[in-house]
Amino acid sequence: MQQDGTQQDRIKQSPAPLNGMSRRGFLGGAGTLALATASGLLLPGTAHAATTITTNQTGTDGMYYSFWTDGGGSVSMTLNGGGSYSTQWTNCGNFVAGKGWSTGDGNVRYNGYFNPVGNGYGCLYGWTSNPLVEYYIVDNWGSYRPTGTYKGTVSSDGGTYDIYQTTRYNAPSVEGTKTFQQYWSVRQSKVTSGSGTITTGNHFDAWARAGMNMGQFRYYMIMATEGYQSSGSSNITVSG
């Protein structure tokens, strides 16, 4: 990333995760990801309502879900069926958890709360291929608001978002270690109502106008809670 040494760098350059697998490598599932372990392969499973998980996994619980932690502090995700999930974290290292779609580019509705004490994002998060792009649409954040190379603004769903582009060099991704672009839409003011809509096409079109071309939507898209060296909680329900 271009902003070496900044807090933005640090949240994306987290300590080595469990079993030596990166967060991006773990989350690349598109519904078929397997987590390599010393004893074999942990395949995505089907969870049940009110199931609390603390180990890295993907699966379905009414909707696709993904949970990854680097093992720092105490982090859990509770799967409540349908599009609902909650998280609790205390003195975490880095984690990301969310529900959504194994492949996706559709509109998203959500409600609930995101309550970080320190650094974290409440965001729509996903990847495209060819070109490989990691993208964020950030509606809420904790002590740090992400930035990058400024590309303009887009108005959508009752708010104005600043558009940023950053680059990751030789970094872990859903396609292995590669250099790739990150695209960001970051709301100028946080969503405080507890509910929101993200019309993804508005952001994708604005990125294209700024010369930020997307690829194919072969990979997952989740409404995510991410924390970095912080504590907090969230309770989110996602729908299309």
UniProtKB/Swiss-Prot annotation:
Top EC category: hydrolase
Active site: 134, 226
PROSITE patterns xrefs: GH11_1, GH11_2, GH11_3, TAT
GO cellular component, as recorded: extracellular region
Boundaries of every GH11 domain copy: 51-239
Signal sequence region: 1-49
EC number, UniProt record: 3.2.1.8
Consequence the record notes for mutating residue 23 to K: 4-fold reduction of XlnC production and severe impairment of precursor processing. 7-fold reduction of XlnC production and severe impairment of precursor processing
Keyword vocabulary terms for this entry: Carbohydrate metabolism, Glycosidase, Hydrolase, Polysaccharide degradation, Secreted, Signal, Xylan degradation
Stretches for region Disordered: 1-21
Pathway entry: Glycan degradation; xylan degradation
Note: Replacement of the wild-type signal peptide with a Sec-dependent signal peptide resulted in a mature product that was translocated but that lacked enzymatic activity. The lack of activity was probably due to an incorrect folding. No xylanase activity and no XlnC protein were detected in the supernatant of a tatC mutant.
Purpose of the protein: Contributes to hydrolyze hemicellulose, the major component of plant cell-walls.
Name of the molecule in the record: Endo-1,4-beta-xylanase C
Species in which this protein is naturally found: Streptomyces lividans
